Amino acid sequence: EGPDIGGSLGRYRQSERLEIYKKYVDQLLKEKRAYYCFCTKDELEQDRQAMLTQGLAPKYSGKCRSLEDGTVTIQLKNGDSHVIRFHIPEARVEFKDLIRGSISFDAALMGDIVIAKDPTVPLYNFAVVVDDYEMEISHVIRGEDHLANTPKQILIQAALGFPQPEYA
């Protein structure tokens, strides 16, 4: 099974799976687990600096989370620059890593993460969650540099109702 030999779980290149990602982005948007964010780079930097000044770890403030549907529709029709953010619930994310053992993260420290540039252009943490589910991946082996991505991926899996693979 793979891109060179094919198989039942195929389309293996992310560029060939855009409609699959769109389906799941649309699901999260419909369920209000994700939302359009129209914040500019300057606004995000101002918010970041304000948090640092207050001695807080910088994270997205969530200000676009409560935009009215009508406002979002107008901004999208106007072609306003945007991304799609996943609403991170305030919870502890706990999982068992097959190498490191039990790991726990405080999701409230993360802030809402960007999962797509638009419904058909997913970013890494979203795309791998969908790919793992659609391709029936049971074990995710990753480097230490991706350990911090795991709680984000687990929260996205839970929001989509996907089973959680084993991590190592």
List PLM regions with ranges.
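A glycine-rich helix N-cap at a beta->alpha junction
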Residues: 1-9
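Short, solvent-exposed turn/loop segments enriched in Gly/Ser/Thr/Pro and often Arg
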Residues: 3, 13-16, 40-41, 167-168
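Active-site cores that bind ATP or allylic diphosphates and position pyrophosphate for catalysis
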Residues: 27-168
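Conserved short loop/turn motifs at secondary-structure junctions
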Residues: 8-17, 141-143
